[in-house]
């Protein structure tokens, strides 16, 4: 038994852990094993996804990554090779009239706004994004909807078998998971004859596999920050260099206001490449020439994403000679940023409706269910968590109760990869949660039946250990805060007025209790206490309330007039929660 499992069993005694029993190691082993690849088209959707999942740990790919790490350009060359093996050439992608978008935070929301705007013009849209919330087919959308299981299965096996057929002595490997899905998206969009494709970069830009695109119609860079440091660099300037790698000669690009250093890097990259780069004016500037704009996505930070989306959509329409766009005001240079400002124009009715009707699950999303309110945001960088906290606190302010009923505030958190979870948790601490709950991005620990939610790159032990580390960080922050409060208002020493010493007040218990569960389902069972009208499991795991904090908290949760739950730190965590709270997303 590993240290992580032993620690969980001995200190928490949660049913989520004890019910795991012997299945944990078996599940972990099964997770690391390869599924046999079916050879016949027409297989079921789950079979296709299971085969796709084997590419997460493809041994030859991992070896290839090691060889290519010192030569990132080789990654793009490999992607072009896979594209050729699949029956396409790079030039074929030009027919997709692509909008290529990168950034650290907000790139997915920007893409969603952009796609929705252009769909309002009667255009047939393709949209490639990552990661998925519940089902992998969400990554490839036609007219805003994930492709059907049948279409996914059809295209998956056609591509898989094509790549298998054209293996040779020098090209024996299959593409990795994300490369495969990128290739598949291109094939789907071409065969479905979309008018345009909105393509979100996976990681970075310069050496991302989507960057085999040679002639996009327009490019965009959303807000920059620190993320994926092991791949992109440990400063925002280094990351900006990677993001600017999607710029193409003569292709317009737009970005939002950035810190001076990374913006200068983007400007220099654009000049070197020969790309005209524009700075988006704030949304307020476009509202000055029209009515206020309503956004379908909540949060003040979405205004920056919407401003970028409007410029991308407007530029695409202009370059495609679309008639239904307003006359532009003359663009003027920005002296402060040393970049030309993008045009200010009057948003058309199609644009206005597009912004208003945009839906993007798991980003500043609120689900109101009986006494429970779920606040879902996949923020996973310091800047995006800051924005998440601002949105969450504003949302709480709007929903303040007037009847004086008791309220409970809960944080459900996980963070993966090389992200600094201690820094993220520190940003969340001021929200004054009553309980902090941690769990891995595993929907059901005892089941591996749903291939969409599987991650073969880590074991259950590893992710449980990570959750324990999150809990330790959180408890450390709480203790530090308690210590700070202890001395913040010191009283005279009891020895008498002549003493020069100050005595702290008696220690107070820390406000937040913390718990670790071994899967999302068990965490939601404890949080909801059967009070969510949709999330109603047939039976509770044994010993779910064995831990004193879980037991005492359960009675508080059952009696609370309102329960507010912020789910954040990982898009995969949010996706797992949505899978359980919104069964329609699995259909």
Curated annotation (Swiss-Prot):
Pathway the protein acts in: Cofactor biosynthesis; tetrahydrofolylpolyglutamate biosynthesis
Reaction catalysed by this enzyme: (6S)-5,6,7,8-tetrahydrofolyl-(gamma-L-Glu)(n) + L-glutamate + ATP = (6S)-5,6,7,8-tetrahydrofolyl-(gamma-L-Glu)(n+1) + ADP + phosphate + H(+)
An example molecular function term from Gene Ontology annotations: metal ion binding
Cofactor(s) needed: a monovalent cation
Keyword annotations: ATP-binding, Cytoplasm, Ligase, Magnesium, Membrane, Metal-binding, Mitochondrion, Mitochondrion inner membrane, Nucleotide-binding, One-carbon metabolism, Phosphoprotein, Transit peptide
Binding site for ATP: 106-109, 363, 377
Activity regulation text: Inhibited by ammonium sulfate. Inhibited by pentaglutamate derivative of DDATHF, but isoform 2 is inhibited to a greater extent at lower concentrations of the compound that is isoform 5. Isoform 5 is virtually unaffected by H(4)PteGlu(5) and 5,10-CH(2)-H(4)PteGlu(5) at concentrations that substantially inhibits the activity of isoform 2. Isoform 2 and 5 are equally sensitive to polyglutamates of 10-CHO-H(4)-PteGlu.
Details of cofactor binding: A monovalent cation.
Role this protein plays: Catalyzes conversion of folates to polyglutamate derivatives allowing concentration of folate compounds in the cell and the intracellular retention of these cofactors, which are important substrates for most of the folate-dependent enzymes that are involved in one-carbon transfer reactions involved in purine, pyrimidine and amino acid synthesis. Dihydrofolate, tetrahydrofolate, 5,10-methylenetetrahydrofolate, 10-formyltetrahydrofolate and 5-formyltetrahydrofolate are the best substrates. Folic acid and 5-methyltetrahydrofolate can also act as substrates.
The organism's place on the tree of life at top rank: Eukaryota
Keyword presence, Repressor: no
Residues where Phosphoserine is found: 539
Positions of Mg(2+) 1 binding: 130, 200
Protein name in UniProt: Folylpolyglutamate synthase, mitochondrial
Tissue specificity: With non-specific probe, highest content in kidney and liver and lowest in spleen, lung and small intestine, and readily detectable in all of the tumors except hepatoma. Isoform 1 and isoform 2 expressed in leukemic cells and isoform 4 and isoform 5 in liver cells. Isoform 1 and isoform 2 exclusively expressed in hepatoma and Lewis lung carcinoma. Isoform 1 and isoform 2 also expressed in bone marrow, small intestine and spleen. Kidney expresses isoform 1, isoform 2, isoform 4 and isoform 5.
Subunit structure and binding partners: Monomer.
The keyword Flavoprotein belongs to this UniProt entry's keyword annotation: no
Thermal activity profile: Optimum temperature is 37 degrees Celsius. Activity completely lost within a few hours at 4 degrees Celsius in the absence of ATP and glycerol.
Family, per entry: Belongs to the folylpolyglutamate synthase family.
Record: residues binding Mg(2+) 2: 228
pH-related activity note: Optimum pH is 8.2-9.5 using 500 uM folic acid (PteGlu) and 25 uM dl-5-formyltetrahydrofolate (dl-5-CHO-H(4)PteGlu) as substrates.
GO biological process: glutamate metabolic process; one-carbon metabolic process; tetrahydrofolylpolyglutamate biosynthetic process
Organism, scientific name: Mus musculus
E.C. number: 6.3.2.17
Matching InterPro entries: Folylpolyglutamate_synth, Folylpolyglutamate_synth_CS, Folylpolyglutamate_synth_euk, Mur-like_cat_sf, Mur_ligase_C_dom_sf
């Amino acid at each position: 038994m590993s240290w992580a499992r032993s620690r969980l069993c001995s200190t928490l005694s949660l049913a989520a852990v004890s019910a795991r029993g012997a299945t944990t190691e078996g599940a972990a082993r099964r997770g690391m094993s390869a599924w046999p690849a079916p050879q016949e088209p027409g297989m079921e959707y789950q079979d296709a996804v299971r085969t796709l999942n084997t590419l997460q740990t493809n041994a030859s790919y991992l070896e290839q990554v090691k060889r290519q790490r010192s030569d990132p350009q080789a990654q793009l060359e490999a992607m072009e090779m896979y594209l050729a093996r699949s029956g396409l050439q790079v030039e074929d992608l030009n027919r997709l009239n692509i909008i290529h978008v990168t950034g650290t935070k907000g790139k997915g929301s920007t893409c969603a706004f952009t796609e929705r705007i252009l769909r309002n013009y009667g255009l047939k849209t393709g949209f490639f994004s990552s990661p998925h919330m519940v089902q992998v087919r969400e990554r490839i959308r036609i007219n805003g909807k994930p492709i059907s299981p049948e279409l996914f299965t059809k295209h998956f096996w056609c591509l898989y078998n094509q790549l298998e057929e054209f293996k040779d002595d020098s090209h024996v490997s299959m593409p990795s998971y994300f490369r495969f899905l990128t290739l598949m998206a291109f094939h789907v969009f071409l065969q479905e004859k979309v008018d345009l494709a909105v393509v979100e970069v996976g990681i970075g830009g310069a050496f991302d596999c989507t960057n085999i695109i040679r002639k996009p119609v327009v490019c965009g860079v959303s807000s920059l920050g620190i993320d994926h440091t092991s791949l992109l660099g440990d400063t925002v300037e280094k990351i900006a260099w990677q993001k600017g790698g999607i710029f193409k000669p003569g292709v317009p690009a737009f970005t939002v206001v950035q810190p001076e250093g990374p913006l200068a890097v983007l400007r220099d990259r654009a000049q070197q490449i020969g790309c005209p780069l524009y700075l988006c004016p704030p949304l307020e500037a476009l509202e000055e020439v029209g009515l206020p704009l309503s956004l379908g996505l909540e949060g003040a930070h979405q205004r920056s994403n919407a401003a970028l989306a409007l410029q991308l959509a407007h530029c695409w329409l202009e370059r495609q000679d679309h008639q239904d766009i307003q006359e532009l005001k003359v663009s003027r240079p920005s002296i402060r940023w040393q970049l030309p400002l993008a045009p200010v124009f009057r948003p058309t009715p199609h644009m206005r409706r597009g912004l208003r009707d945009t839906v993007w699950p798991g980003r500043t999303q609120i689900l109101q269910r009986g006494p429970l309110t779920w606040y879902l945001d996949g923020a996973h960088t310091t800047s995006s968590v800051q924005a998440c906290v601002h949105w969450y606190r504003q949302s709480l302010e709007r929903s303040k109760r007037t009847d004086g009923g008791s309220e409970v505030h809960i944080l459900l958190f996980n963070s993966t990869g090389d992200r600094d979870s201690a820094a993220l948790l520190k940003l969340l601490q001021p929200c004054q949660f009553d309980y902090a709950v941690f769990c891995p991005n595993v929907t059901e620990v005892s089941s591996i039946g749903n291939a969409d939610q599987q991650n073969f790159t880590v074991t259950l032990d590893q992710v449980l250990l990570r959750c324990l580390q999150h809990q330790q960080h959180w408890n450390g922050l709480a203790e530090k805060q308690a210590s700070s409060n202890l001395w913040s208002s010191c009283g005279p020493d009891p020895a008498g007025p002549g003493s020069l010493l100050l005595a702290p007040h008696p220690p107070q218990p820390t406000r937040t209790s913390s718990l670790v569960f071994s899967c999302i389902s068990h965490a939601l069972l404890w949080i909801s206490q059967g009070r969510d009208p949709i999330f109603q499991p047939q039976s509770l795991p044994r010993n779910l309330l064995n831990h004193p904090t879980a037991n005492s908290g359960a009675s508080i949760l059952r009696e609370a007039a309102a329960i507010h739950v912020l789910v954040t730190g990982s898009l995969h965590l949010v996706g797992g929660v949505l899978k359980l709270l919104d069964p329609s997303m699995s259909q």
